[in-house]
């Protein structure tokens, strides 16, 4: 599809102004999921549809104010929920929501932790309190920080025994690969993971190739979320290195 797009754009460039070529490039990219930002309800819908069964548990890593989790709970209110948010401001907001809904949702565990591939304290950088772009990796516009506890997921889950981890959402501003390495052997128990790829990976010097190779090693298929639904990425190609926020779903072929 991408090679067809490039041929079409090359032909168009001979007969139309550059701004039109740019428009068609963005349109083709968007239709194939590049830079496509669906609603949270749409993301959850696609994940549950691809999962094919009602999940017993859900993990969100990088919760912010909990909007994604709220959409999940609308669909599967009885599942066990594990939430990880390192920011004290955001943690307080989520905690308030849970306390308010505790009679309805008594199945939520909240952790004031960042998840990565190490167990230690680190700086969490942000531009303003409560920012959705807080990150363990400092970016040029982030001039503030707080010290947070960082843990590996396999360390946290030593005391939480799950036969299978059904549904995971990761949004950690470019730290996704570090976070995934912290799963250790738990990754083999995971059925589905939704994650983002975009310009935050530039700061980490990470590429889609790195994410692809990680999931491929553990027999996951990767799909990109598009306006037309999920499209399977059959093999890695360099044109996947598109540093505009896009959403992906990885699903384990083995369980």
Label for each model-derived stretch:
Residues 1-255:
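Phosphate/nucleotide-binding beta-alpha loop and adjacent structural elements of enzyme active sites
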